[in-house]
Each structure stands twice: as C-alpha cells, then as structure tokens.
C-alpha cells in the first residue's frame, strides 16, 4: 500500500492561476448566507468541483464539475473515479489532492511492473521444433486419450462388476383379452344386470347377455372408441 504523500508543493499551480485559487478559496466559505454556490476542490488536471443549493430539494445540494479548459468537449476531460463517486453521491466526502496523488503513484508503479514483466517474457526464447515439449507435438486427440496401464484397467473393471446394475423397468403389461378366461371377464360384468329385473327363465337369458359381453370385450380390446356426436339439445327460451 502506497502511503499518502505529504504535499510540499502545489500540484495544480501551473494549471490554475493564483488569483483564481484565491477566489475559489473565498467561494468555498459556506457560512455566508448570501452564497448559493460553494467551491469544493480540484483534481490533478485543474478541474473544479462545486456544490449549490437545489431549489426542488433544499435538503440536498447539487454537485457539478467545471472544466479547467472550457473550450474542450466534456468527453475529452478525464475525471478521476474518486470525484465521479462524489458527483454521484456514492461517496460522503470529496477526495483530497493527497489521495489523488497517491492513486496516481499506484497506477504508475503498476504500469512499471507490467512493463518489466513484459520485457522479461520477451527475453525468453520461443519454443521451436527442437526444444518443444512432447505434449505440443501431440495432436489434441492424442492428448485427450486416457493413459491407463493394464493393471489399472483390470482394477476398474473389477470395481464396475461389483456395482449392482439396476434392471430396466418392465413395460406396462397390456392384458390379452383373447387369453383371459370367461369367468374373469364375467367378474367385471355389471352387478345390476338382467338378474335383478328378469323373472323366471331370465337366468338363461342373463347368461346369453354375459356371453355377448365377453365377445364384445374381446373384440374391442385395445381399440379406441369411435366418436359419436350427440344431437344438440334445443333450449327453450
């Protein structure tokens, strides 16, 4: 971590004139009732940051930046991220020049380390066909092939044999109506059949109806029923 430097010189002396700095210092005094705009601070490029009262919300000030060179477009001005956080009210206190200088030194040190590492990697000679690794000469298919010995393969085979294999689920059994006995089909015959409504001699007739039911079940087994539309019922209105 880079320590916060102690300023022994003014880093913005060549960017902001002295009379303007005195004027901004006076504008930074906030205990004067007739002022509506207050100076807050500078960045290392000389841009000034201000606060002024919000007419729509008196309890919250508005924050703006005034570029040091108004002739340039706002896109050409590089605002430090610390001041961007302050402008967006994600930072309670504004950054100081010491903090900005410390962050600039950190970036310069990081760039110097990156340049040193890049120079170090450039000194390492590239691998040629003579000193290349064996893995580089192998194709991708050969590199992806597993390299197991015969003993390892035999051990894995024994492990797989000990693992219980789950049997495949049996398909749903569809009853074959032709192979079902007549008594089994008659069990499903409706109980409220002709036995309950017929008189003498109805038992033989009931048996005939049951046999017709058996033949019908055998013929219609597994066949979808045909759709027979019903006549619409006319409503009386």
From Swiss-Prot:
Alphabetical keyword list: Chaperone, Mitochondrion
Taxon lineage: Eukaryota, Fungi, Dikarya, Ascomycota, Saccharomycotina
Q: Which purpose does this protein serve, as stated in its record?
A: Acts as an assembly factor of mitochondrial complex I.
What is the first-listed, main subcellular location in coarse terms? mitochondrion
Which terms under GO biological process does the entry name?
A: mitochondrial respiratory chain complex I assembly
Q: Where is this region: Disordered?
A: 214-237
Q: Where in the cell is it found?
A: Mitochondrion
Protein name, entry field? NADH-ubiquinone oxidoreductase assembly factor N7BML
Q: Which species is this record about?
A: Yarrowia lipolytica (strain CLIB 122 / E 150)
Family the entry assigns: Belongs to the complex I NDUFA12 subunit family.
**What GO terms fall under cellular component here?**
mitochondrion; respiratory chain complex I
Which intervals carry biased composition (Basic and acidic residues)?
Answer: 214-223
Please report a single Pfam family linked to this protein.
Answer: NDUFA12
Asked if the Swiss-Prot or TrEMBL record annotates the protein with the keyword Mitochondrion, the reply is: yes
| InterPro entries, per the entry | ComplexI_NDUFA12, NDUFA12
């Amino acid at each position: 971590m880079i320590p916060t430097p102690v300023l022994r010189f003014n880093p913005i002396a060549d960017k902001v004139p002295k009379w303007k700095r005195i004027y901004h210092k006076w504008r930074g005094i906030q205990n004067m009732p007739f002022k509506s705009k207050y100076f807050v601070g500078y960045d290392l490029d000389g841009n000034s940051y201000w606060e002024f009262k919000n007419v729509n919300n008196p309890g919250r000030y508005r924050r703006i930046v005034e570029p040091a060179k108004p002739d340039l477009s706002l896109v050409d001005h590089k605002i430090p991220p610390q001041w961007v956080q302050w402008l967006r009210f994600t930072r309670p206190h504004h950054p100081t020049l010491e903090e900005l200088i410390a962050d600039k030194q950190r970036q310069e040190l990081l760039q110097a380390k990156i340049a040193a590492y890049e120079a170090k990697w450039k000194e390492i000679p590239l691998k040629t066909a003579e000193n290349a690794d064996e893995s580089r000469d192998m194709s991708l298919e050969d590199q992806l092939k597993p390299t197991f010995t015969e003993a390892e393969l035999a051990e894995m085979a024994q492990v797989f044999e000990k693992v219980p294999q789950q049997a495949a689920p049996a398909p749903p059994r569809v009853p074959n109506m032709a192979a079902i006995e007549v008594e089994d089909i008659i069990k499903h015959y409706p109980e409220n059949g002709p036995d309950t409504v017929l008189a003498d001699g109805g038992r033989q007739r009931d048996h005939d109806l049951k046999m017709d039911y058996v033949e019908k079940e055998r013929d219609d087994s597994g066949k979808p029923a045909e759709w027979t539309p019903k006549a619409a019922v006319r409503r009386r209105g």
